[in-house]
C-alpha cells in the first residue's frame, strides 16, 4: 500500500518545506501523518528542524509552545495524502509519532517514544523511559533502548535487541525475536509464530513466553536460579543441559534450576520448546539454516 501511494503521488511531491524552531528542555514532539514517512534523527542543538516533501496543494503547519511542537499537514482538497518528513530533534526530546499508511523510523533518541501506524513499519534505535511501538500491518523493530518497552504488531514480526528493562511483545501472525535482553520482567505472546528469547534470567524475575502454532527457544544462563513450568499439547521439549522433571503429566511438567527464585513459564500448543545456554540459540539457527540449504541443493 505504501508503494502504491508513493507511485501515485511521486510526481506531486514537488514542494519542499524546511523550518527550524527553538525548543526548551522537556518539550515534546507530536507528528501525525496520513501517508508517507516520518524519519527522526537527533542532534545537539536546542531546536527542531522539520524538512518535508509534499504536494504543492499541501501546507505543513507547525504549532510550537514551551511544552510541545505539533506538526501536521493540511490540503486545500481535504486531508493530505503523502508527506515525507525528515525531522531532527534534541536527543532527549520525547516523541509521539503516528500515521496510517506511514513508515516510522527513529535513530539516536534518548527520550521517551510512542510510535503507532496502521500499514507501515516501525524501526527505532534508541529510547529511554517508556518506549511503545505499534503497527497493524508492518514489522516492529527496536534496538538499544532502556526502560519500559511495549511492542505490538498484528500481522508481522517483532524484533528487539540490546534492550534493558521490562519488555512486553505481542503479535498475532508473526515471529518474535528478543535478543541481548537485560530484563527482570519479560513477556512475549503470539498465535501463529515462533518466539526466541536470548537474555538474562534474573533472581526474582518473571518471564512468560506463549505461542499457539509455533516453537519456543529460550536461553537460560548457567548460574540462573529459576522455576520453570512447561506446557505443550502437540510438541516436544528439549534442553541443551540436564534437567530433573517434576510434577509431570501428559502435557505439563516443571523443574527447578538452582534456588528457583525466578519464574519462567513456557507454553506452546502446536510447537516444540527448547532451552539452551546464551548464544547457543543463534548457533542452532545457523545449523538449521545450513541443513535446510543442503537439503534444497540435494533436491535440485
Residue ranges and their predicted role:
Residues 1-300:
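Intrinsically disordered, low-complexity terminal regions
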Amino acid at each position: 500500500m505504501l508503494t502504491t501511494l508513493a507511485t501515485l503521488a511521486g510526481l506531486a511531491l514537488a514542494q519542499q518545506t524546511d523550518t527550524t524552531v527553538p525548543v526548551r528542555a522537556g518539550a515534546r514532539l507530536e507528528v501525525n501523518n496520513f501517508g508517507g514517512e516520518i524519519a527522526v534523527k537527533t542532534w545537539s542543538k536546542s531546536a527542531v528542524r522539520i524538512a518535508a516533501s509534499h504536494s504543492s496543494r499541501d501546507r505543513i503547519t507547525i504549532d510550537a509552545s514551551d511544552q510541545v511542537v505539533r506538526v501536521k499537514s493540511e490540503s486545500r482538497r481535504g486531508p493530505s495524502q503523502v508527506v515525507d518528513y525528515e525531522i531532527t530533534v534534541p536527543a532527549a526530546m520525547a516523541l509521539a509519532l503516528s500515521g496510517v499508511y506511514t513508515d516510522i523510523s527513529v535513530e539516536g533518541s534518548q527520550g521517551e517514544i510512542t510510535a503507532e501506524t496502521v500499514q507501515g513499519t516501525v524501526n527505532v534505535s534508541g529510547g529511554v523511559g517508556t518506549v511503545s511501538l505499534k503497527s497493524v500491518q508492518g514489522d516492529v523493530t527496536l534496538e538499544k533502548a532502556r526502560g519500559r518497552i511495549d511492542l505490538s504488531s498484528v500481522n508481522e514480526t517483532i524484533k528487539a535487541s540490546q534492550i534493558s528493562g521490562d519488555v512486553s511483545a505481542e503479535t498475532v501472525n508473526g515471529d518474535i525475536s528478543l535478543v541481548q535482553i537485560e530484563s527482570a520482567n519479560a513477556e512475549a505472546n503470539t498465535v501463529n509464530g515462533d518466539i526466541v528469547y536470548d537474555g538474562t534470567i534474573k533472581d526474582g524475575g518473571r518471564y512468560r513466553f506463549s505461542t499457539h502454532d509455533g516453537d519456543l527457544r529460550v536461553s537460560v544462563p548457567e548460574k540462573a536460579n529459576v522455576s520453570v513450568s512447561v506446557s505443550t499439547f502437540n510438541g516436544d521439549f528439549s534442553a541443551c543441559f540436564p534437567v530433573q522433571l517434576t510434577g509431570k503429566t501428559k502435557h505439563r511438567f516443571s523443574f527447578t534450576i538452582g534456588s528457583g527464585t525466578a519464574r519462567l513459564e513456557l507454553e506452546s500448543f502446536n510447537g516444540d520448546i527448547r532451552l539452551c545456554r546464551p548464544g547457543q540459540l543463534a548457533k542452532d539457527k545457523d545449523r538449521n539454516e545450513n541443513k535446510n540449504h543442503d537439503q534444497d541443493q540435494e533436491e535440485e
